[in-house]
Amino acid sequence: MTDSRNSTEVKTAALLSTLVPAEDGFPAAGELDIPGAFAKDVAADGNEALVEQLLKALPDDFADQSDANRENVLKSIEADQSAVFGSVLRHVYNAYYTNPTVREVLEKAEGYPARPPLYAGYEMDTFDPESLTVQRKRKPFWRKA
């Protein structure tokens, strides 16, 4: 495979596209610009070692294999390392379904709005700390732990 990206990036893109292939108007995960979102989601949970473990379990020629072979490799890894596989898959889904392109496809297909879920079209007033004056004067009415 001639690709200017390094082997880890190529393997990751193949992994993403195998886990979430193109289907019914949805793009494959590896075709999108989600590696950054994927890495950020992984880092937020401190799961970099799990991703590294999964990538090391993939054969060097994983990206060059057929879709069926890649699926079989991942099924084998899922059977042997189910916790690792499940964690990585969750991060892939988080990155995929928050991608603007995927959200647009969802909106067209299902009518699910491709925007943040709350306060669409509503402007919130700037918070006024003075509105808490009365509460601050009250004695606590809860038990301290």
Locations of the language-model features?
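Ligand-binding pocket scaffold of soluble enzyme catalytic domains
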Residues: 1-9, 20
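Mature-region segments of soluble proteins
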Residues: 10-17, 26-29, 33-44, 48-145
